[in-house]
Amino acid sequence: MQYSEIMVRYGELSTKGKNRMRFINKLKRNIQAVLSVYPKVHVKADRDRTHVYLHGTDYQPVAESLKQIFGIQNFSPSYKIEKSVPALIEAVQSIMKEVYQEGMTFKITSKRSDHSFELDSRELNQTLGDAVFEAIPNVQVKMKAPDIELRVEIREEAAYISYETIRGAGGLPVGTSGKGMLMLSGGIDSPVAGYLALKRGVDIEAVHFASPPYTSPGALKKAQDLTRKLTKFGGNIQFIEVPFTEIQEEIKAKAPEAYLMTLTRRFMMRITDRIREERSAQVIINGESLGQVASQTIESMQAINAVTNTPVIRPVVTMDKLEIIDIAEKIDTFQISIQPFEDCCTIFAPDRPKTNPKIKNAEKYETYLDVEGLVERAVAGIMITEITPQAETDEVDELIEGLL
C-alpha cells in the first residue's frame, strides 16, 4: 500500500486561544511554501490538524521537509482505505503483518467524523482488534503506550489508517512573532541565530554586507546558500545585499586602527536599522556570542548598540562555540560556513581591536566621516533577491576549485 496523505498535528498552537486559526493558517502557508517543489501535493488545514495530500508524490522527501517546519508537533503518514468494514479489516491485517515483531503489543483507536458509518467507534475497535488476533494469534493488547497503535479515522469521503508518529520541529510557525532583520555574515554563528529566531516564529530577512573587490563573488554566493538552508524551516527569504566598500575604505583611511571594528559594526547596525524601518520589521537579529571575539565583549556590544533604539536579539549570546557548531551541523549550514571565502568583517580586521571601546571615542572618530551620507548611499544601493528552497545554479564548488 502507498501512503495517501500525512496528518499534521500542532505544537504550541493549542495554547493560542482566539488567535488559533491565524496561527494555523500561517502554518498552512509555510507548509505550502516549503512543499512547493512538489507540484502534486495539496495542503488543507482545519482547527485540529493539517492534511497534506500526496497524490502519488513520494512520501519520504515530503516527510523530511515536514520535520523542519516550525509549528508542527508531530505527523503521521496515512493510508486511504475504502469506507467499508471488509476493506478496513483487510488493511489492518496487512499493516500488522508488515510491522509486527515477536513480543510487540498493539492498540486500535477509532474516530468517526461520519456518524452514518455502520459501526460506532467502540464497535469498530472491537471488530478490527478481532481481525488482528485472527491474523496474529499471539499478539497482546496494551491500552497505555503500546508498541503499535493503529489509528483509524472514518471521514465522509473515505477511511484512513495510520500507525507511525514522527516528531516535528516544534516551535511556532514562522511569521507569527513579527519580523526581524538577520545580520548574516557567512560565518557559523549568524545562520544559527537565524534558525533560532525562526523557531520562535520570527519571519526573517537576511542582510549581508558585501565589499567587492575585497570580498569575492564566492563570499556572496556562500551567504545566499546559507540563506537557502534556512528556507526549509518556513519558506522563501528575502536576501538583502548591502554595498559596503566605500564605508570600509573611509573607515580604514580616517579612523584609528583599534576602532576599525567598532566603527564598522556601528555602521552595519545603522544600515540594518534603516532597512528594518523601511521594510516594516520590529527587531534586529545577529550572531554575537559573548566573549567569542574581541568585538563581542559587553563593552563592545554597548558601543555598537548605542546607534539604535531598536531591540537587538542575540539568540546565541550565551552559547560556546561547540554548542553553536552542534546546531550548525544539525541544520546543515556548518560545511557552507567554513568555505574559504572572507567576508567584510575579516578583510580589514585590525591586529589589536579595542575590546572595551568607549562610546564617546567612537562618536569622536565618526566626526571624521560623512556618516549620514555613507549610510544613505549604502541603503540606496541595496539589492534584494528572493531566496527559495531550490537553487537556480550551484556555483560554489566551481568557485572553491578556482581557489585551489
Swiss-Prot record:
The keyword Transcription does not apply. Pfam families: ThiI, ThiI_fer, THUMP. Pathway: Cofactor biosynthesis; thiamine diphosphate biosynthesis. SUPFAM superfamilies: Adenine nucleotide alpha hydrolases-like, THUMP domain-like. Keywords: ATP-binding, Cytoplasm, Nucleotide-binding, RNA-binding, Thiamine biosynthesis, Transferase, tRNA-binding. One of its GO terms (biological process) is thiamine biosynthetic process. The keyword ATP-binding applies. ATP binds at residues 183-184, 208-209, 265, 287, 296. SMART domains: THUMP (SM00981). It catalyses: [ThiI sulfur-carrier protein]-S-sulfanyl-L-cysteine + a uridine in tRNA + 2 reduced [2Fe-2S]-[ferredoxin] + ATP + H(+) = [ThiI sulfur-carrier protein]-L-cysteine + a 4-thiouridine in tRNA + 2 oxidized [2Fe-2S]-[ferredoxin] + AMP + diphosphate; [ThiS sulfur-carrier protein]-C-terminal Gly-Gly-AMP + S-sulfanyl-L-cysteinyl-[cysteine desulfurase] + AH2 = [ThiS sulfur-carrier protein]-C-terminal-Gly-aminoethanethioate + L-cysteinyl-[cysteine desulfurase] + A + AMP + 2 H(+). CDD domains: PPase_ThiI, THUMP_ThiI. Its main location: cytoplasm. Its EC number is 2.8.1.4. InterPro entries: Rossmann-like_a/b/a_fold, ThiI_AANH, ThiI_fer, ThiI_N, THUMP_dom, THUMP_ThiI, tRNA_STrfase, tRNA_sulfurtransferase_ThiI. NCBIfam families: tRNA uracil 4-sulfurtransferase ThiI. Belongs to the ThiI family. PANTHER family: TRNA SULFURTRANSFERASE (PTHR43209:SF1). This is Probable tRNA sulfurtransferase. It comes from Streptococcus sanguinis (strain SK36). The lineage of its organism: Bacteria, Bacillati, Bacillota, Bacilli, Lactobacillales.
